[in-house]
């Protein structure tokens, strides 16, 4: 997040390429991955162990099925192998070939299988998209066309589009919605707030927990909801986020009220009564938890 912010705020980037890899973890090619790992590891015992891990397969109705592609999910080594795969397929290729062929500046930001690329010129972004499709195809990967786009984004995009009354697009990355905004002095500022998807996912989690534990003591419910909410605050505690975080807090309180009413069959359990109870309270979000990100 810090690296992406630095690129958007300080570098020459008026265009942003956003993409999604379709079923990435299910389409990693084992042969290619073995070659990539062997490029840095010479110990045959470790290479054999990794091969066994990849061939572990999965079980359906008591029958073990093995696959020649994909990385087994759920284990500690799977994220490492998946990251190695994209390091060779995308990262090194971008640094050694794409950046050298671009007319302007270009910067790749990747975390696991999520990535965005900032370009100074649109022609470079379009050429990259064409080359990336071919590059991924060579290694068994495919871009999700419905989630792949080139947009105007950044401080230069804001100035140019502002002349015609338009605004830059927004994009989601690592759970945050990224927006071109301004600071108090009217200068460009990157605004990041929890995305709609991340908020809905978290609220679905709290709703499900309340449904399963609606008969627990109110004090125990309050303790667990506080832990969940503080974890959410801890991740999303950036500039501009606290209004959305407090909206999430209010929605959880509504979920809690609904659960209490269902449990007691007291549909007239009013807010005025609950707000007087010492246990009916959840922590509010502070303005900034991570000021340097």
Sequence positions of predicted segments:
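Non-catalytic terminal/accessory segments
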Residues: 1-293
């Amino acid at each position: 997040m810090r690296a992406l912010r630095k690129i958007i705020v300080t570098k020459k980037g008026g265009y942003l390429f956003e993409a999604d890899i379709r079923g990435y973890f299910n389409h990693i090619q084992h042969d290619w991955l073995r070659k990539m790992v062997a490029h840095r590891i010479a110990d045959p015992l470790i290479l054999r162990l990794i091969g066994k891990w990849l061939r572990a397969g999965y079980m359906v109705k008591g029958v073990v099925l093995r696959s020649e592609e994909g990385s087994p999910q759920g284990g500690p080594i799977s994220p490492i192998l998946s990251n190695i795969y994209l390091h060779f397929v995308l990262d090194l290729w971008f640094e050694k070939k794409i950046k050298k062929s671009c007319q302007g500046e270009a910067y790749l930001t990747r975390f696991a299988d999520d990535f965005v690329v900032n370009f100074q010129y649109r022609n470079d972004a379009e050429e990259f998209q064409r080359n990336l499709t071919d590059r991924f195809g060579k290694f068994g990967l495919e871009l999700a066309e419905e989630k792949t786009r080139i947009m105007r984004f950044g401080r230069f995009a804001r100035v140019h589009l502002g002349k015609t009354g338009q605004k830059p697009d927004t994009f989601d990355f690592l759970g945050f919605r990224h927006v071109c905004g301004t600071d108090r002095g009217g200068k460009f500022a990157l605004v990041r707030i929890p995305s709609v998807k991340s908020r809905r996912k978290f609220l679905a989690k709290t709703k499900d927990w309340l449904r399963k534990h609606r008969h627990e003591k109110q004090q125990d419910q309050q303790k667990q909801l506080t832990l969940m909410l503080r974890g959410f605050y801890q991740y999303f505690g950036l500039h501009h986020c606290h209004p959305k975080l407090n909206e999430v807090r209010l929605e959880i309180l509504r979920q809690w009220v609904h659960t209490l009413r269902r449990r007691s069959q007291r549909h007239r359990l009013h807010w005025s009564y609950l707000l007087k109870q010492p246990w009916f309270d959840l922590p509010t979000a502070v303005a900034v938890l991570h000021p340097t990100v």
